[in-house]
Amino acid sequence: MADLKPYIAKAASGEPLSLEDSRAAFDIMMSGQATPSQIGGLLMALRVRGETVPEIAGAVASMRSRMLGVSAPNNAIDIVGTGGDQSGSYNVSSCSAFVVAGAGVPVAKHGNRALSSRSGAADALAALGINIEADASIIGRSITEAGLGFMFAPMHHSAMRHVGPSRVELGTRTIFNLLGPLSNPASVKRQLVGVFAPQWLVPLAEVLKELGSEAAWVVYGDGLDEMTTAGTTQVAALENGRIRTFEITPEEVGLRRCDPAELKGGEAAVNAKALLGVLEGEKNAYRDIVLLNSGAALVIAGNAKDLKEGIALAAQSIDSGAALDVLQKVIAVSNDKAA
């Protein structure tokens, strides 16, 4: 039986793990060969020292090797946040996913139930009537027929059951908060990834580059794990094999700066109602932040030359009814009915 102890000792001494060591350590944890206290020990040793790019890349490689995959077109995109930003905001990435799909880009949306907020992507989408536990073939069909498929993380990463109890008992952020967005079951090559702290912008862009992404923006929105209209968004963009960093304000792309309180969400039912409101054309701060994130995703997808054009295409997706149409089709297909 493989032994996690040498890796714990190495990490605890402050020594970084190589990508190969990290993958081996996570393979041991994800195959049920480590005790909960060993798992907790390694996770906290990494957290206290600060996880490195090779450690994250090795952990992602281990997760990806065990996941239940979903087939999706080559140009599919994901819009996802790490969670853990403690903001309690609306489900921005989920709403943006419908808008991007309505603009003609296939979306393979990966998400989970709430970890630190009151409503995660899965909670809100389930409240809208989407079957979040659809099997992989139905999700693949949903991406093809409806333009969007939702992949509920626990259904695709069953090996996570071996580390779940340790994560719950630790009750604090670990490397696993970073791994979910990087372990998309449809193996998308284009992503908009929100992070809970700015120090992760460049490292996660480097991990995505290391693991073969074609284009990605890793973003932090002044306290939010998405782009924000309540402040300045910091971006690390992976484009053509290079990473560049820049900042975006709402004003420079023609959007109103809002008060952070205007972005506060609530329980799943509240967030689902608000999401539906945006897709039905309500004009408010939630719409604006969705336009910003959707616009960025359309740039990453290659469908818009810049953020202003992306925002215009996103507005058109909502105002034409296309985004709402995607939601209705996803509800139908996920429940195994014709779209």
UniProtKB/Swiss-Prot annotation:
Organism lineage string: Bacteria, Pseudomonadati, Pseudomonadota, Alphaproteobacteria, Hyphomicrobiales
NCBIfam families: trpD
Keyword Ribonucleoprotein part of the UniProt annotation: no
Gene Ontology molecular function: anthranilate phosphoribosyltransferase activity; magnesium ion binding
Binding site for Mg(2+) 2: D225, E226
Chain's role: Catalyzes the transfer of the phosphoribosyl group of 5-phosphorylribose-1-pyrophosphate (PRPP) to anthranilate to yield N-(5'-phosphoribosyl)-anthranilate (PRA).
Record key words, sorted: Amino-acid biosynthesis, Aromatic amino acid biosynthesis, Glycosyltransferase, Magnesium, Metal-binding, Transferase, Tryptophan biosynthesis
Entry protein name: Anthranilate phosphoribosyltransferase
Enzyme class: transferase
